[in-house]
């Protein structure tokens, strides 16, 4: 037991479900809609991720469990260069966990608050990257419904990634949505008349993109709308406000923003082809955009943490249930919950048991590994396909 003794690295079974013990907690970096976010490192691969954790009891008490489950269901089916992708989801008795891409460039709201002045060419590339993400979501029948600077993260190179699918909706074909959801200053006009039966579709995300792009360029939004503004006032604002565009902006950018901020969803730009065919985008190599080969005009400062540093204090000092004390707390909780001391406690435990049973466990690493294993077999089957022979020399 001397200095020559070294700790053996933990052994991981690739078929085992990922759990909390597979990660090292490094630091807290932010708050999500229903939980908090910290930086973690996976012990076997040493890869860094962001881990969002949501307290089950709080989710039950706030009736938010279904939203979490829906977000998990949606994110498991998505993978794109300009999204924040889900890698793992798991649970313990206390929390639900989502492990996603780690993006340390901060969200666009943070940079706006730091008085960053985004140049037109920078915003132009942001728009290109975001419309590719929106096109992908549209093909997957997903409406995000909360596009705004707060939900757009930058990676260390300055590329944008859409996050937070908590109020996203899956849209069956030939249907529209009538429920109102979103952040009012970024919600499209048709969303405020949806209760009258008209409904809305994918075009609402493109309106939100227009509001966001305008705000990035000017530092304020095109319409004076707050979260506290009533729906009636918002409708009146849309009907009476004439959006102004600074003369310093190029006419091409102004024309594009007008297409995104078109009140009529049938005339609004809401397809990737709309933007790609727009004259302002003639100089864009879209393959290079997708492959992140175009250099953004704004690159986050690598020498600073691009988030509010108070999150670390809240987690480690002020938070009544800090994550780094989880193991000790769970052991005590298991002992305390062996008996129900009231009907209310028993009812809560029933709900928590239901969450435990219905939670969706996910491991993208395993999904990708299984997919790659199937590929050689698929290729072999195709070479044996007699229908593939056309009697011609197909070698090029």
Curated annotation (Swiss-Prot):
Record-level GO cellular component terms: plasma membrane
GO molecular function, one term: protein serine kinase activity
Membrane topology per record: Lipid-anchor
Keywords linked to the UniProt accession: ATP-binding, Cell membrane, Kinase, Lipoprotein, Magnesium, Membrane, Metal-binding, Myristate, Nucleotide-binding, Serine/threonine-protein kinase, Transferase
InterPro entries reported in the protein's UniProt record: Kinase-like_dom_sf (IPR011009), Prot_kinase_dom (IPR000719), Protein_kinase_ATP_BS (IPR017441), Ser/Thr_kinase_AS (IPR008271)
Listed Pfam families: Pkinase
Keyword Magnesium: yes
Cofactor: Mg(2+)
Residues the record marks as active site: 146 (proton acceptor)
Disulfide bond positions: none
Domain Protein kinase residues, every copy: 23-281
CDD domains tied to this protein: STKc_Yank1
Lipidation (N-myristoyl glycine): 2
EC number: 2.7.11.1
Reactions mediated catalytically: L-seryl-[protein] + ATP = O-phospho-L-seryl-[protein] + ADP + H(+); L-threonyl-[protein] + ATP = O-phospho-L-threonyl-[protein] + ADP + H(+)
Broad class of where this protein is predominantly found: membrane
Ranges for region Disordered: 373-396
Subcellular compartments: Cell membrane
Protein name: Serine/threonine-protein kinase 32A
Taxonomic source organism: Homo sapiens
Lineage, opening ranks: Eukaryota, Metazoa, Chordata, Craniata, Vertebrata
Underlying gene: STK32A
């Amino acid at each position: 037991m001397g200095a020559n003794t070294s700790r053996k690295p933990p052994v991981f079974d690739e078929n085992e479900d990922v759990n909390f013990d597979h990660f090292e907690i490094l630091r807290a970096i932010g708050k999500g809609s229903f939980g908090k976010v910290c930086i973690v490192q996976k012990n076997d691969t040493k890869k860094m991720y962001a881990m969002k954790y949501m307290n089950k009891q709080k989710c039950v008490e706030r009736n938010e469990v279904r939203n979490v489950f829906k977000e998990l269901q949606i994110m498991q089916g998505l993978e794109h260069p300009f999204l924040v992708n889900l890698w793992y989801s798991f649970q313990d008795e206390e929390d639900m966990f989502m492990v996603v891409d780690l993006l340390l460039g901060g969200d666009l709201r943070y940079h706006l608050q730091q008085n960053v002045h985004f140049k037109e060419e920078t915003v132009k590339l942001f728009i290109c990257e975001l419309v590719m993400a929106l096109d992908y979501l549209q093909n997957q029948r997903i409406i995000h419904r909360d596009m705004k600077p707060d939900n757009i993260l930058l990676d260390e190179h300055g590329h944008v990634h859409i996050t937070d699918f908590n109020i996203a909706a899956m849209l069956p074909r030939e249907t529209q949505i009538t429920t109102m959801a979103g952040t009012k200053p970024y919600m499209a006009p048709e969303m405020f008349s949806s209760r009258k039966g008209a409904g809305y579709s994918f075009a609402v995300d493109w309106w939100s993109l227009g509001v966001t792009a305008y705000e990035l360029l000017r530092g304020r939004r095109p319409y004076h709308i707050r979260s506290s503004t009533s729906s009636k006032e918002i409708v009146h604002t849309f009907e009476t406000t004439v959006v102004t565009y600074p003369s310093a902006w190029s006419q091409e950018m102004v024309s594009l923003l007008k297409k995104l901020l078109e009140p009529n969803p049938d005339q609004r730009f809401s397809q990737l082809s709309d933007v790609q065919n727009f004259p302002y985008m003639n100089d864009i190599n879209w393959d290079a955009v997708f492959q992140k080969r175009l250099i953004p005009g704004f690159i986050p400062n690598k020498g600073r943490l691009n988030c509010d540093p108070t999150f670390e204090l809240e987690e480690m000092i002020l938070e009544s249930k800090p994550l780094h004390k989880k193991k000790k707390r769970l052991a005590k909780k298991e002992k305390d919950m062996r008996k129900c001391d009231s009907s209310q406690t028993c009812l809560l435990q029933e709900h928590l048991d239901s969450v435990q049973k219905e939670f969706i466990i996910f491991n993208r690493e395993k999904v990708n590994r299984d997919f790659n294993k199937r590929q050689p077999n698929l290729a072999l089957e195709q070479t044996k396909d007699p229908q593939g022979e056309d009697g011609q020399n197909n070698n090029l």
